[in-house]
From Swiss-Prot:
Keyword rRNA-binding included in the entry's annotation: no
GO CC annotation terms, alphabetical: endoplasmic reticulum membrane
Record function comment: Diglyceride acyltransferase that uses fatty acyl-CoA as substrate. Particularly active with oleate as a substrate. Has no wax synthase activity to produce wax esters.
Predominant location: endoplasmic reticulum
Protein name: Diacylglycerol O-acyltransferase 2-like protein 6
Length: 337
């Protein structure tokens, strides 16, 4: 009860909204993983499992073809509490014309991409109002869509696989006015995310540029200021037994599950306490100017490198123009590796 006595109702709801975010995926994923085999083997309700698997097979391509987004889910009140916990804000610097399609590259990944999720997978910060006529899709690991219930949940928020098949479908076969949000640095970039760090994994990440050229989608840089400040990440000194086990665990999970696992901590249920919740620190996602991209069926390496360099320049410009306004010093530099 000490937790309740130290917080007002709004703070309690904000904390609970963030607390549920990751566990709900585990809970929803555990239901079919446990229930389907159990019903199939140990009960007379085996037909329920058969129907669930049949539906998954029948509906297999939906997540790669735009999914089933729900305005109701994207506007849930819980996301407003989630937003206000930090708080999170979406800032537009230039209009996005509904006559084109876009790849919005999101930096940095963060230990967890809170800003990217709230700004693009929900309507809490007003994406539809800020960018009228644009439909956002947040790209993530395809493995999530192999799990019944979880796939329905994430599709309802406009989440899609970060696969070439899904990206090209959205950018060439769904008309115009679509924007696919890609966290270019991926999970590997999460390992670089420490308070005060402004490092993005981008030099060798050129696949999104190639897809943009093959589809003619404009490239849009975006940077979430504050996203690296909400967790402290522990990287133990090289040569120590802690680092040995940390690296072994990270390498194993990366190989088996394609997940980059961070050793992190934040606050607890109350401000000032220790735990794994993010710190209450503002996150502002600034969406930059779209970079026009020609459509080239088979772009060569030189062309990809050219537009990759132009994108890096656009991201650098966006960062430099807004860093002071959102809490960084004039001398802070964006490090691109």
């Amino acid at each position: 009860m000490a937790f309740l006595s130290q917080l007002n109702l709004q703070e309690i709801l904000q904390t609970l909204s963030v607390l549920q975010w990751m566990p709900v995926y585990v809970f929803l994923g555990a239901i079919p993983i446990i229930v389907i085999p159990y019903f199939l083997v140990f009960t007379k309700f085996w037909m329920v499992s058969v129907l669930a698997l049949a539906w998954l097979a029948y509906d297999w391509n939906t997540h790669s073809q735009g999914g089933r987004r729900s305005a109701w889910v994207r506007n849930w009140t819980i996301w407003k509490y989630f937003q206000n916990y930090f708080p999170i804000k979406l800032v537009k610097t230039h209009d996005l014309s509904p006559r084109h399609n876009y790849i919005i590259a999101s930096h940095p990944h963060g230990v967890l991409p809170y800003g990217t999720f709230i700004n693009f997978a929900t309507e809490t910060t007003g994406f539809a109002r800020i960018f009228p006529g644009i439909t956002p899709y947040v790209a993530t690991l395809e493995g999530i869509f192999w799990i019944p219930i979880v796939r329905e949940y994430v599709m309802s928020m406009g989440v899609c696989p970060v696969s070439e098949l899904a990206l090209k479908y959205l950018l060439t076969q769904k008309g115009s006015g679509n924007a696919v949000v890609i966290m270019v640095g991926g999970g590997a970039e999460a390992l670089l995310c420490h308070p005060g760090a402004t490092t993005v994994l981008l030099k060798q990440r050129k696949g999104f540029v190639k897809v943009a050229l093959e589809t003619g989608a404009y490239l849009v840089p975006s940077y979430s200021f504050g996203q690296n400040e909400v967790h402290n990440q522990e990287t133990f000194p090289e040569g120590t037994w802690k680092r040995f086990f940390q690296k072994a665990l990270q390498d194993t999970l990366k190989k088996l599950l394609r997940l980059s696992v961070c050793t992190f901590h934040g606050r607890g249920l109350t401000r000032g306490s220790w735990g794994f919740l993010p710190f209450n620190h503002p996150i502002t996602t600034v969406v930059g100017e779209p970079l026009p991209i020609p459509r080239i069926k088979k772009p060569n390496e030189e062309t990809v490198d050219k537009y990759h360099a132009l994108y890096i320049n656009a991201l650098q410009k966006l960062f430099d123009e807004h860093k002071v306004q959102y809490g960084l010093s004039e001398t802070q530099e964006l490090t691109i590796i």
